[in-house]
Amino acid sequence: MAVEKVYQPYDEQVYNSIPKQQPQTKPEKKTVSRKVVVQLTKFEKVLYITLITVIAMLSIYMLSLKMDAYDTRGKIADLDYKIDKQSSENSALQSEIKKNSSYERIYEKAKKQGMSLENDNVKVVRSNGEAKN
C-alpha cells in the first residue's frame, strides 16, 4: 500500500498577494567577555610539582617491582624444570641400582669370577654395621 502526498499547485499570484512582514529588530546587547588568566601561587606550584614527582617515582617503583617479579617467575620456572629433570634422572638411576643389586645378578657375577657360595663363609651385615653369623 503506497502513500502519496498531495501538493497544492503553485500559484504565483497567491504567493505575491500575501503581505510580507519585516521582522522587528530589537537592539542587541553585546556582551564582552574577557579571558582572565589566574596566576598560581608559589605554594600551589610547589605542591603540583611535588605531587607530579611523587606520582612519577611511585610509577617507576611499581614498574621496577613488576620487572623483579617477572624475573623471579622466570627463575622459578627454570628451577622447576631442572628439578623435574634431576628427579627423572634420579628415578632412572634408582631403577638401575635395583636391577644391578639383585641377588641373581650378584650370584651370576660371582660364578663368572670363580667364586662359590658356602654358607659357612657368609656373614650377614646389617645397615648399622653389625655382623651376624
From Swiss-Prot:
Membrane-protein topology: Single-pass type II membrane protein
As given in the record, the signal peptide range reads none
- Identify the main location: membrane
Q: Which residues does the entry place in the Extracellular compartment? A: 66-133
**Where does the source fall among the domains of life?**
Bacteria
Gene Ontology cellular component list: cell division site; plasma membrane
Where, subcellularly, is it found?
Cell membrane
Q: What does this protein do?
A: Essential cell division protein.
What this protein is called in its record is Cell division protein FtsL
Name of the gene encoding the protein in the UniProt record: ftsL
